[in-house]
């Protein structure tokens, strides 16, 4: 089964505010872009992935991620400023299904800089057995991937505590080991240290090398 992934990227100037203890205001936009670039590059290298649709209103992110082979689309112009992440994912999934009605679709976080193509393929392979499925994040409270098989809506419920919401929505939680790179999103300095320990992509490695991160 070949999946199309929807990856939401918020405006870089507002991204990763919780990394303020690790990265200065002037540095965080570049770090967020590096996370997204390494995430998208790894996703496109996964054998289970047909393509990646990036939903963003940030022109730099759109340009850089398109250069990697993703398709960048703006957020839904009919959506209000408070509609946020889940509206962007619904919009991206709808665009995918407009072109390929029977395509399996998965939402993937943009902040998985240690992502391994083989681990992502394994997660998507497991998800293919269910109408909807999700993978919890490393912290055990959120979600890094939500998948919907052909004929089923994505119905995203991302945000704090999304693991519980996705489970209550009927999505099956994937109980997989050895897929740490798909679970390790980066919101805090501790998350970044954990991702660096797994081994991040080249753009994140270069950006992180300019930071003083204790323990690295």
UniProtKB/Swiss-Prot annotation:
Guanylyltransferase that catalyzes the activation of phosphoenolpyruvate (PEP) as enolpyruvoyl-2-diphospho-5'-guanosine, via the condensation of PEP with GTP. It is involved in the biosynthesis of coenzyme F420, a hydride carrier cofactor. SUPFAM superfamilies: Nucleotide-diphospho-sugar transferases. It holds the Pfam family NTP_transf_3. Belongs to the CofC family. This is Phosphoenolpyruvate guanylyltransferase. Its EC number is 2.7.7.105. Pathway: Cofactor biosynthesis; coenzyme F420 biosynthesis. It catalyses: phosphoenolpyruvate + GTP + H(+) = enolpyruvoyl-2-diphospho-5'-guanosine + diphosphate. GO terms for biological process: F420-0 metabolic process. GO terms for molecular function: GTP binding; phospholactate guanylyltransferase activity. InterPro entries: CofC (IPR002835), MobA-like_NTP_Trfase (IPR025877), Nucleotide-diphossugar_trans (IPR029044). Phosphoenolpyruvate binds at residues 143, 159, 162. Keywords: GTP-binding, Nucleotide-binding, Nucleotidyltransferase, Transferase. It is an enzyme of class 2 (transferase).
